[in-house]
Protein backbone atom coordinates (compact mmCIF):
# COMPACT_ATOMS: atom_id res chain seq x y z
CA UNK A 1 0.00 0.00 0.00
CA UNK A 2 1.03 3.57 -0.55
CA UNK A 3 0.39 6.59 1.63
CA UNK A 4 -1.79 9.20 -0.14
CA UNK A 5 0.22 12.21 -1.27
CA UNK A 6 -2.01 14.70 0.55
CA UNK A 7 -1.21 12.96 3.83
CA UNK A 8 2.50 12.78 3.09
CA UNK A 9 2.79 16.44 2.22
CA UNK A 10 1.23 17.53 5.51
CA UNK A 11 2.99 15.04 7.76
CA UNK A 12 6.45 15.41 6.27
CA UNK A 13 6.22 19.15 6.56
CA UNK A 14 5.38 18.74 10.24
CA UNK A 15 8.45 16.64 10.70
CA UNK A 16 11.02 19.04 8.74
CA UNK A 17 18.63 -23.17 19.00
CA UNK A 18 18.72 -26.91 20.17
CA UNK A 19 16.90 -29.07 17.78
CA UNK A 20 15.23 -32.13 19.38
CA UNK A 21 16.01 -31.66 23.07
CA UNK A 22 17.02 -29.01 25.53
CA UNK A 23 20.72 -29.83 25.27
CA UNK A 24 22.96 -27.10 23.80
CA UNK A 25 22.95 -27.00 19.97
CA UNK A 26 25.63 -29.07 18.27
CA UNK A 27 28.48 -27.05 16.77
CA UNK A 28 30.65 -29.34 14.62
CA UNK A 29 34.35 -28.84 13.92
CA UNK A 30 33.58 -28.35 10.24
CA UNK A 31 30.11 -26.79 10.31
CA UNK A 32 27.90 -26.99 7.27
CA UNK A 33 24.79 -24.95 6.66
CA UNK A 34 21.41 -26.55 6.31
CA UNK A 35 20.79 -27.62 2.74
CA UNK A 36 19.44 -24.62 0.85
CA UNK A 37 20.81 -21.89 3.13
CA UNK A 38 24.16 -20.76 4.53
CA UNK A 39 22.47 -18.57 7.11
CA UNK A 40 23.76 -19.23 10.63
CA UNK A 41 20.84 -17.32 12.09
CA UNK A 42 18.39 -19.84 10.62
CA UNK A 43 19.94 -22.85 12.31
CA UNK A 44 20.40 -21.08 15.65
CA UNK A 45 16.84 -19.76 15.76
CA UNK A 46 15.36 -23.06 14.55
CA UNK A 47 17.16 -24.84 17.37
CA UNK A 48 15.73 -22.44 19.96
CA UNK A 49 12.23 -22.49 18.45
CA UNK A 50 12.02 -26.27 18.64
CA UNK A 51 12.53 -26.09 22.40
CA UNK A 52 9.88 -23.39 22.87
CA UNK A 53 7.24 -24.96 20.64
CA UNK A 54 7.93 -28.62 21.52
CA UNK A 55 7.37 -29.49 17.85
CA UNK A 56 8.47 -33.05 17.18
CA UNK A 57 11.94 -33.01 15.67
CA UNK A 58 12.92 -35.70 13.15
CA UNK A 59 16.03 -34.08 11.64
CA UNK A 60 18.63 -32.74 14.13
CA UNK A 61 19.50 -29.08 13.70
CA UNK A 62 23.20 -28.34 13.34
CA UNK A 63 24.15 -24.75 14.11
CA UNK A 64 26.44 -23.26 11.46
CA UNK A 65 28.95 -21.67 13.83
CA UNK A 66 31.10 -20.00 11.18
CA UNK A 67 28.13 -18.38 9.46
CA UNK A 68 26.68 -17.38 12.80
CA UNK A 69 29.91 -15.64 13.79
CA UNK A 70 29.72 -13.47 10.68
CA UNK A 71 26.40 -11.95 11.76
CA UNK A 72 28.05 -9.98 14.57
CA UNK A 73 25.18 -10.69 16.95
CA UNK A 74 23.69 -13.40 19.07
CA UNK A 75 20.34 -14.18 17.43
CA UNK A 76 17.63 -15.18 19.82
CA UNK A 77 13.88 -15.42 20.15
CA UNK A 78 12.72 -12.37 22.10
CA UNK A 79 9.11 -13.52 22.51
CA UNK A 80 6.91 -16.46 21.55
CA UNK A 81 3.15 -17.07 21.52
CA UNK A 82 0.88 -19.92 20.51
CA UNK A 83 -2.57 -18.56 19.65
CA UNK A 84 -5.46 -20.91 18.76
CA UNK A 85 -7.62 -19.37 16.03
CA UNK A 86 -10.46 -21.89 15.97
CA UNK A 87 -11.22 -24.80 13.69
CA UNK A 88 -8.05 -26.60 14.74
CA UNK A 89 -5.88 -23.80 13.34
CA UNK A 90 -3.12 -22.28 15.45
CA UNK A 91 -1.03 -19.14 15.03
CA UNK A 92 2.58 -19.40 16.21
CA UNK A 93 4.23 -16.01 16.61
CA UNK A 94 7.90 -15.21 17.27
CA UNK A 95 9.87 -12.00 17.66
CA UNK A 96 13.45 -12.72 16.66
CA UNK A 97 16.60 -10.66 17.14
CA UNK A 98 18.56 -10.74 13.87
CA UNK A 99 21.13 -7.99 14.44
CA UNK A 100 23.08 -6.06 17.03
CA UNK A 101 20.80 -3.00 17.10
CA UNK A 102 17.98 -2.66 19.61
CA UNK A 103 15.42 -2.55 16.77
CA UNK A 104 16.96 -5.35 14.68
CA UNK A 105 13.99 -7.62 15.31
CA UNK A 106 11.68 -9.37 12.87
CA UNK A 107 8.37 -11.07 13.48
CA UNK A 108 7.98 -14.64 12.23
CA UNK A 109 4.55 -16.24 11.95
CA UNK A 110 3.22 -19.71 11.28
CA UNK A 111 -0.49 -20.45 10.78
CA UNK A 112 -1.29 -24.15 10.42
CA UNK A 113 -3.72 -26.90 11.34
CA UNK A 114 -2.82 -29.08 14.30
CA UNK A 115 -3.56 -32.76 14.86
CA UNK A 116 -2.95 -32.29 18.59
CA UNK A 117 -1.47 -29.77 20.99
CA UNK A 118 1.71 -28.36 19.38
CA UNK A 119 1.52 -31.00 16.63
CA UNK A 120 1.38 -29.24 13.24
CA UNK A 121 -0.41 -31.29 10.61
CA UNK A 122 1.74 -32.46 7.72
CA UNK A 123 0.91 -30.57 4.52
CA UNK A 124 1.84 -30.86 0.87
CA UNK A 125 1.80 -27.11 0.31
CA UNK A 126 3.55 -24.17 1.96
CA UNK A 127 3.68 -20.42 1.40
CA UNK A 128 5.50 -17.43 2.88
CA UNK A 129 3.62 -14.12 3.10
CA UNK A 130 5.25 -10.66 2.96
CA UNK A 131 3.05 -7.70 3.95
CA UNK A 132 3.16 -4.27 2.32
CA UNK A 133 3.32 -0.69 3.56
CA UNK A 134 1.77 0.43 6.84
CA UNK A 135 0.68 -3.04 8.00
CA UNK A 136 2.14 -6.11 9.64
CA UNK A 137 1.40 -9.81 9.06
CA UNK A 138 -1.64 -10.01 11.33
CA UNK A 139 -3.14 -6.74 10.17
CA UNK A 140 -2.94 -7.84 6.54
CA UNK A 141 -3.37 -11.61 6.54
CA UNK A 142 -5.34 -12.18 9.78
CA UNK A 143 -7.52 -9.04 9.80
CA UNK A 144 -10.20 -10.60 11.99
CA UNK A 145 -7.73 -10.59 14.89
CA UNK A 146 -7.64 -6.77 14.72
CA UNK A 147 -11.34 -6.13 14.11
CA UNK A 148 -14.56 -6.74 16.00
CA UNK A 149 -16.48 -6.28 12.74
CA UNK A 150 -14.84 -8.95 10.56
CA UNK A 151 -16.29 -12.47 10.41
CA UNK A 152 -14.54 -14.77 12.86
CA UNK A 153 -11.58 -16.46 11.22
CA UNK A 154 -11.56 -14.20 8.15
CA UNK A 155 -8.15 -13.80 6.56
CA UNK A 156 -5.94 -15.22 3.84
CA UNK A 157 -3.70 -17.01 6.34
CA UNK A 158 -6.57 -18.89 8.00
CA UNK A 159 -8.19 -19.62 4.63
CA UNK A 160 -5.02 -21.25 3.33
CA UNK A 161 -4.32 -23.08 6.60
CA UNK A 162 -7.86 -24.50 6.57
CA UNK A 163 -7.05 -25.77 3.07
CA UNK A 164 -4.00 -27.68 4.35
CA UNK A 165 -1.33 -25.11 3.52
CA UNK A 166 1.58 -24.46 5.90
CA UNK A 167 1.46 -20.65 6.10
CA UNK A 168 4.48 -18.61 7.19
CA UNK A 169 5.11 -14.89 7.15
CA UNK A 170 7.17 -11.98 8.40
CA UNK A 171 6.87 -8.65 10.17
CA UNK A 172 9.57 -6.36 8.80
CA UNK A 173 11.47 -4.55 11.60
CA UNK A 174 9.85 -1.16 10.97
CA UNK A 175 6.44 -2.62 11.88
CA UNK A 176 7.73 -3.33 15.39
CA UNK A 177 9.04 0.16 16.20
CA UNK A 178 6.80 1.42 19.02
CA UNK A 179 4.78 4.62 18.92
CA UNK A 180 6.52 7.38 20.82
CA UNK A 181 10.00 6.53 19.54
CA UNK A 182 12.00 9.76 19.13
CA UNK A 183 15.42 8.73 17.84
CA UNK A 184 15.23 7.14 14.38
CA UNK A 185 18.88 7.18 13.39
CA UNK A 186 18.72 3.37 13.32
CA UNK A 187 16.37 3.64 10.31
CA UNK A 188 18.82 5.53 8.12
CA UNK A 189 19.85 2.50 6.08
CA UNK A 190 16.61 0.54 6.30
CA UNK A 191 16.04 0.44 2.57
CA UNK A 192 14.99 -2.20 0.09
CA UNK A 193 18.14 -4.27 0.61
CA UNK A 194 17.42 -4.46 4.34
CA UNK A 195 13.93 -5.76 3.53
CA UNK A 196 15.41 -8.35 1.17
CA UNK A 197 17.88 -9.55 3.78
CA UNK A 198 15.30 -9.83 6.55
CA UNK A 199 12.81 -11.57 4.26
CA UNK A 200 15.40 -14.16 3.24
CA UNK A 201 16.36 -14.67 6.89
CA UNK A 202 12.72 -15.27 7.81
CA UNK A 203 12.31 -17.73 4.95
CA UNK A 204 15.52 -19.53 5.91
CA UNK A 205 14.29 -19.96 9.49
CA UNK A 206 10.94 -21.28 8.25
CA UNK A 207 12.68 -23.79 5.98
CA UNK A 208 15.05 -24.89 8.75
CA UNK A 209 12.08 -25.57 11.03
CA UNK A 210 10.17 -27.39 8.30
CA UNK A 211 13.20 -29.59 7.62
CA UNK A 212 13.74 -30.35 11.30
CA UNK A 213 10.09 -31.34 11.81
CA UNK A 214 9.73 -33.60 8.80
CA UNK A 215 8.14 -31.20 6.30
CA UNK A 216 11.07 -31.39 3.90
CA UNK A 217 13.51 -28.77 2.71
CA UNK A 218 11.75 -27.43 -0.36
CA UNK A 219 12.19 -23.79 -1.19
CA UNK A 220 9.03 -21.76 -0.61
CA UNK A 221 6.38 -20.04 -2.66
CA UNK A 222 6.54 -16.34 -1.77
CA UNK A 223 3.55 -14.00 -1.83
CA UNK A 224 4.46 -10.32 -1.71
CA UNK A 225 1.58 -7.89 -1.34
CA UNK A 226 1.84 -4.27 -2.46
CA UNK A 227 5.30 -2.96 -1.52
CA UNK A 228 5.95 -6.45 -0.16
CA UNK A 229 5.76 -7.48 -3.80
CA UNK A 230 8.47 -4.93 -4.54
CA UNK A 231 10.56 -6.66 -1.88
CA UNK A 232 9.65 -9.97 -3.51
CA UNK A 233 10.70 -8.94 -7.01
CA UNK A 234 13.94 -7.49 -5.63
CA UNK A 235 14.55 -10.73 -3.71
CA UNK A 236 14.17 -12.77 -6.90
CA UNK A 237 16.60 -10.40 -8.61
CA UNK A 238 19.03 -10.85 -5.70
CA UNK A 239 18.74 -14.64 -5.68
CA UNK A 240 19.82 -14.95 -9.30
CA UNK A 241 23.27 -13.95 -8.06
CA UNK A 242 23.63 -16.47 -5.22
CA UNK A 243 24.25 -20.23 -5.47
CA UNK A 244 21.14 -22.31 -6.07
CA UNK A 245 21.47 -24.05 -2.69
CA UNK A 246 21.26 -20.67 -0.92
CA UNK A 247 18.07 -19.51 -2.64
CA UNK A 248 14.82 -19.42 -0.67
CA UNK A 249 12.13 -18.82 -3.33
CA UNK A 250 10.82 -21.36 -5.84
CA UNK A 251 7.68 -19.52 -6.96
CA UNK A 252 6.29 -16.00 -6.66
CA UNK A 253 2.86 -14.39 -6.28
CA UNK A 254 3.12 -10.60 -6.66
CA UNK A 255 -0.21 -9.48 -5.19
CA UNK A 256 -1.42 -6.23 -6.77
CA UNK A 257 1.97 -4.64 -7.32
CA UNK A 258 4.06 -3.51 -10.23
CA UNK A 259 7.85 -3.47 -10.23
CA UNK A 260 8.72 -1.81 -13.51
CA UNK A 261 6.53 0.32 -15.77
CA UNK A 262 6.50 1.82 -19.25
CA UNK A 263 3.65 4.18 -18.31
CA UNK A 264 4.73 7.85 -18.01
CA UNK A 265 1.93 8.57 -15.52
CA UNK A 266 3.25 5.88 -13.19
CA UNK A 267 6.79 7.21 -13.54
CA UNK A 268 5.60 10.72 -12.64
CA UNK A 269 3.57 9.51 -9.66
CA UNK A 270 6.40 7.54 -8.09
CA UNK A 271 9.02 10.18 -8.89
CA UNK A 272 6.84 12.74 -7.12
CA UNK A 273 6.43 10.39 -4.19
CA UNK A 274 10.19 10.10 -3.89
CA UNK A 275 10.59 13.87 -4.07
CA UNK A 276 8.45 14.22 -0.94
CA UNK A 277 10.90 12.13 1.08
CA UNK A 278 14.22 13.40 -0.27
CA UNK A 279 14.43 16.76 1.59
CA UNK A 280 13.44 15.36 4.97
CA UNK A 281 15.73 12.35 4.56
CA UNK A 282 18.62 14.65 3.68
CA UNK A 283 17.81 16.63 6.84
CA UNK A 284 18.09 13.50 8.98
CA UNK A 285 14.42 12.49 9.18
CA UNK A 286 14.58 8.77 8.44
CA UNK A 287 11.06 7.75 9.49
CA UNK A 288 7.80 8.26 7.61
CA UNK A 289 4.79 8.65 9.91
CA UNK A 290 1.87 6.44 8.93
CA UNK A 291 -1.51 8.21 9.28
CA UNK A 292 -3.72 5.12 9.14
CA UNK A 293 -4.57 4.98 12.85
CA UNK A 294 -5.31 8.71 13.10
CA UNK A 295 -7.60 8.70 10.07
CA UNK A 296 -9.51 5.64 11.24
CA UNK A 297 -9.93 6.86 14.80
CA UNK A 298 -11.19 10.32 13.82
CA UNK A 299 -13.60 8.93 11.22
CA UNK A 300 -15.11 6.67 13.85
CA UNK A 301 -15.26 9.08 16.79
CA UNK A 302 -15.79 12.45 15.08
CA UNK A 303 -16.98 11.83 11.52
CA UNK A 304 -18.31 15.34 10.88
CA UNK A 305 -15.34 17.14 12.43
CA UNK A 306 -12.81 19.02 10.32
CA UNK A 307 -9.95 16.81 9.21
CA UNK A 308 -6.50 17.81 10.49
CA UNK A 309 -5.00 15.70 7.72
CA UNK A 310 -6.73 16.95 4.56
CA UNK A 311 -7.92 20.54 5.08
CA UNK A 312 -11.40 21.19 3.75
CA UNK A 313 -12.67 17.65 4.31
CA UNK A 314 -14.42 16.12 7.28
CA UNK A 315 -12.86 13.18 9.06
CA UNK A 316 -15.32 10.78 7.40
CA UNK A 317 -14.68 12.28 3.96
CA UNK A 318 -10.96 11.87 4.55
CA UNK A 319 -11.40 8.18 5.37
CA UNK A 320 -13.59 7.71 2.29
CA UNK A 321 -11.12 9.51 0.05
CA UNK A 322 -8.35 7.44 1.56
CA UNK A 323 -10.34 4.30 0.65
CA UNK A 324 -11.72 5.10 -2.78
CA UNK A 325 -9.92 8.19 -4.09
CA UNK A 326 -7.18 8.28 -6.72
CA UNK A 327 -4.46 8.42 -4.11
CA UNK A 328 -1.51 8.20 -6.51
CA UNK A 329 -2.40 10.89 -9.04
CA UNK A 330 -5.40 12.18 -10.97
CA UNK A 331 -4.21 10.37 -14.11
CA UNK A 332 -3.63 7.05 -12.30
CA UNK A 333 -6.73 4.97 -11.51
CA UNK A 334 -5.30 3.14 -8.48
CA UNK A 335 -7.42 3.16 -5.32
CA UNK A 336 -7.72 1.01 -2.20
CA UNK A 337 -11.36 -0.10 -2.05
CA UNK A 338 -14.34 -0.36 -4.38
CA UNK A 339 -16.79 2.43 -3.62
CA UNK A 340 -19.68 4.60 -4.71
CA UNK A 341 -19.14 8.15 -6.01
CA UNK A 342 -21.29 11.27 -6.10
CA UNK A 343 -21.89 13.31 -9.25
CA UNK A 344 -18.53 15.05 -8.83
CA UNK A 345 -16.64 11.78 -8.53
CA UNK A 346 -16.01 12.06 -4.79
CA UNK A 347 -16.49 8.83 -2.78
CA UNK A 348 -19.59 8.67 -0.60
CA UNK A 349 -19.62 5.02 0.53
CA UNK A 350 -17.80 1.70 0.28
CA UNK A 351 -19.10 -0.97 -2.07
CA UNK A 352 -17.80 -4.25 -0.56
CA UNK A 353 -16.11 -3.56 2.79
CA UNK A 354 -18.15 -1.93 5.58
CA UNK A 355 -17.14 1.38 7.12
CA UNK A 356 -16.55 -0.16 10.59
CA UNK A 357 -14.30 -2.79 8.99
CA UNK A 358 -12.38 -0.06 7.20
CA UNK A 359 -11.95 1.99 10.35
CA UNK A 360 -10.68 -1.10 12.20
CA UNK A 361 -8.20 -1.78 9.41
CA UNK A 362 -6.91 1.79 9.50
CA UNK A 363 -6.60 1.87 13.28
CA UNK A 364 -4.49 -1.31 13.16
CA UNK A 365 -1.84 0.40 11.02
CA UNK A 366 1.73 0.62 12.25
CA UNK A 367 3.03 4.04 13.36
CA UNK A 368 6.21 4.32 11.27
CA UNK A 369 7.94 3.13 8.16
CA UNK A 370 11.47 3.64 6.87
CA UNK A 371 11.87 6.52 4.40
CA UNK A 372 14.71 4.80 2.59
CA UNK A 373 12.51 1.84 1.73
CA UNK A 374 9.98 4.19 0.10
CA UNK A 375 12.74 6.03 -1.74
CA UNK A 376 14.41 2.86 -2.98
CA UNK A 377 11.33 1.32 -4.52
CA UNK A 378 10.11 4.64 -5.90
CA UNK A 379 13.45 4.87 -7.73
CA UNK A 380 13.01 1.39 -9.21
CA UNK A 381 9.51 2.08 -10.51
CA UNK A 382 10.25 5.61 -11.74
CA UNK A 383 13.61 4.65 -13.30
CA UNK A 384 15.53 7.16 -11.17
CA UNK A 385 19.28 6.60 -11.11
CA UNK A 386 20.61 3.07 -11.40
CA UNK A 387 19.34 1.03 -8.44
CA UNK A 388 20.70 -2.53 -8.37
CA UNK A 389 17.37 -4.18 -7.61
CA UNK A 390 16.29 -4.77 -11.23
CA UNK A 391 19.58 -5.66 -12.92
CA UNK A 392 18.95 -9.41 -13.30
CA UNK A 393 15.21 -9.78 -13.89
CA UNK A 394 15.81 -11.65 -17.14
CA UNK A 395 17.55 -14.36 -15.11
CA UNK A 396 14.50 -14.98 -12.90
CA UNK A 397 13.11 -18.40 -13.86
CA UNK A 398 10.59 -19.24 -11.11
CA UNK A 399 6.86 -19.62 -11.88
CA UNK A 400 4.80 -16.47 -11.26
CA UNK A 401 1.13 -15.83 -10.50
CA UNK A 402 0.52 -12.14 -11.16
CA UNK A 403 -2.54 -11.53 -8.97
CA UNK A 404 -3.96 -8.05 -9.41
CA UNK A 405 -7.13 -6.01 -9.06
CA UNK A 406 -8.86 -3.98 -11.77
CA UNK A 407 -9.28 -0.96 -9.50
CA UNK A 408 -5.86 -1.31 -7.89
CA UNK A 409 -2.51 -1.83 -9.55
CA UNK A 410 -3.59 -4.76 -11.71
CA UNK A 411 -3.68 -2.94 -15.07
CA UNK A 412 -0.21 -1.55 -14.40
CA UNK A 413 1.43 -4.87 -13.46
CA UNK A 414 1.69 -6.60 -16.82
CA UNK A 415 4.72 -4.83 -18.28
CA UNK A 416 7.08 -5.74 -15.43
CA UNK A 417 6.39 -9.44 -15.82
CA UNK A 418 7.58 -9.29 -19.45
CA UNK A 419 11.07 -8.49 -18.15
CA UNK A 420 11.33 -11.80 -16.28
CA UNK A 421 13.01 -14.88 -17.70
CA UNK A 422 10.25 -17.22 -16.51
CA UNK A 423 8.26 -19.21 -19.06
CA UNK A 424 5.51 -19.90 -16.49
CA UNK A 425 3.62 -16.66 -15.82
CA UNK A 426 -0.12 -16.57 -15.10
CA UNK A 427 -2.14 -13.36 -14.89
CA UNK A 428 -5.33 -12.95 -12.88
CA UNK A 429 -6.75 -9.44 -12.67
CA UNK A 430 -9.88 -9.43 -10.52
CA UNK A 431 -12.92 -7.32 -11.37
CA UNK A 432 -16.60 -7.29 -10.38
CA UNK A 433 -18.03 -5.57 -13.45
CA UNK A 434 -18.96 -2.11 -12.16
CA UNK A 435 -18.30 -0.62 -15.57
CA UNK A 436 -15.94 2.02 -14.17
CA UNK A 437 -12.35 1.29 -13.16
CA UNK A 438 -12.62 3.96 -10.45
CA UNK A 439 -15.29 1.96 -8.60
CA UNK A 440 -13.87 -1.51 -9.24
CA UNK A 441 -12.58 -4.22 -6.88
CA UNK A 442 -9.34 -2.69 -5.67
CA UNK A 443 -6.05 -2.96 -3.82
CA UNK A 444 -7.17 -3.73 -0.25
CA UNK A 445 -10.39 -5.51 -1.29
CA UNK A 446 -7.98 -8.32 -2.15
CA UNK A 447 -7.68 -9.10 1.58
CA UNK A 448 -10.74 -7.48 3.20
CA UNK A 449 -13.70 -7.89 0.84
CA UNK A 450 -16.12 -10.76 1.56
CA UNK A 451 -15.75 -11.73 -2.12
CA UNK A 452 -11.96 -12.13 -1.79
CA UNK A 453 -12.01 -15.86 -0.89
CA UNK A 454 -13.93 -16.72 -4.06
CA UNK A 455 -12.39 -14.23 -6.45
CA UNK A 456 -8.77 -14.25 -5.29
CA UNK A 457 -7.86 -16.79 -2.63
CA UNK A 458 -9.35 -19.90 -4.25
CA UNK A 459 -7.60 -19.27 -7.60
CA UNK A 460 -4.39 -18.64 -5.64
CA UNK A 461 -4.82 -21.96 -3.85
CA UNK A 462 -5.44 -23.75 -7.15
CA UNK A 463 -2.24 -22.29 -8.58
CA UNK A 464 -0.33 -23.20 -5.42
CA UNK A 465 -1.44 -26.82 -5.64
CA UNK A 466 -0.61 -26.96 -9.33
CA UNK A 467 2.94 -25.87 -8.49
CA UNK A 468 3.76 -28.40 -5.79
CA UNK A 469 7.44 -29.24 -5.86
Regions found by a protein language model. Give the residues of each.
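Alpha/beta-hydrolase fold nucleophile elbow
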Residues: 212-226
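Alpha/beta-hydrolase
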Residues: 267-411
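Short, surface-exposed "cap/lid" segments of acyl-processing enzymes
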Residues: 115-171
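Catalytic active-site module of serine/aspartate enzymes centered on a nucleophile-bearing elbow/loop
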Residues: 428-469
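Conserved loop-alpha-helix segment in the C-terminal half of the alpha/beta-hydrolase fold
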Residues: 403-441
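Alpha/beta-hydrolase active-site loop
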Residues: 187-211
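Bacterial Sec-dependent N-terminal signal peptides
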Residues: 12-54
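N-terminal cap/lid segment of alpha/beta-hydrolase-fold proteins
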Residues: 68-122
Amino acid sequence: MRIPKAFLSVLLLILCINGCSQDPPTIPDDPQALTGTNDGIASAIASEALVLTTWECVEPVTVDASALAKTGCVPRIVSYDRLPLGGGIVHYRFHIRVGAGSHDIIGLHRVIKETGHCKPAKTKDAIFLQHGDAKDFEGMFLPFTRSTHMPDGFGLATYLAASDVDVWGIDQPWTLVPSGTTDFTFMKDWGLQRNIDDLRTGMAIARALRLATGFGNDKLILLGYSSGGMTGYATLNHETQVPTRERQVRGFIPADILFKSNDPAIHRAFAYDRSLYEPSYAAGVYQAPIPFALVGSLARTDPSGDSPVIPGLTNLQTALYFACGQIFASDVSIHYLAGYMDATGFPIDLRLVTLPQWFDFLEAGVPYQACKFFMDYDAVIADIGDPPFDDHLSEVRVPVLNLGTKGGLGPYTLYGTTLLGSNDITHRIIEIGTGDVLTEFAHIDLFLAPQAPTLAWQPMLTWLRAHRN
